[in-house]
């Protein structure tokens, strides 16, 4: 299961998981993003968390439970996924998109009991920890992109004046794929 599955990170994670043989379930917000997950990124199933009853939708999409959860959101989405975690499950934390701030410390369901009874592992993933493998990753990704196995979507806005609105739009979930700001025209 991958949260923010239609975004820049989630879409790549889901596609790579599919390439290596995993069954993939994406969670995204809105019908267009769910369609993108299925049709463009090849997720086996996709769930619209905004459509309500996320718990029931997860049970339907993951009848055998969840072995691996790539968490880009934290918060209520993650709380729902953890209820479906299998014994020995693994949670990779890459982002906390649903949390506007960590001050004060957010309150809500705690994960410790889920991890304990499921004998699960939760670990942070920070890309900089793998700098020594960038060359290897770049070669694999380039091969997959050239072969049509990994697709991506970019939205490029021209001008630094668009940066504040672009960032605010990310937090409102308005982006489809990676949102970029081109500061100046490319030199010719």
PLM regions and their residue ranges:
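Terminal helix/beta-alpha structural elements that buttress the NAD(P)+-binding lobe
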Residues: 1-188
């Amino acid at each position: 299961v991958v949260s923010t599955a239609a975004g820049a990170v989630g879409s790549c994670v889901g596609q790579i998981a599919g390439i290596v043989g995993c069954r993939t379930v994406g969670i995204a917000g809105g019908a267009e993003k769910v369609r993108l997950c299925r049709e463009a990124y090849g997720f086996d199933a996709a769930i619209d968390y905004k459509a309500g009853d996320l718990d029931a939708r997860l049970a339907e999409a993951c009848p055998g439970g969840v072995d691996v959860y790539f968490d880009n959101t934290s918060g209520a989405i993650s709380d729902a996924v953890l209820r479906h975690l299998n014994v020995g499950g693994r949670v990779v934390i890459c982002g906390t998109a649903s949390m506007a701030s960590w001050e004060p410390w957010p309150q809500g369901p705690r994960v410790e009991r889920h991890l304990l009874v499921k004998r699960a592992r939760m670990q942070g993933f920070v890309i900089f920890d793998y700098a020594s493998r960038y060359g290897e990753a770049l070669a694999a990704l380039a091969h997959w992109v050239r072969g049509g196995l990994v697709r991506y979507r970019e939205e490029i806005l021209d001008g630094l004046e668009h940066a504040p609105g672009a960032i605010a739009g990310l937090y409102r979930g308005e982006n489809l794929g990676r949102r970029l700001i081109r500061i100046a025209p490319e030199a010719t």
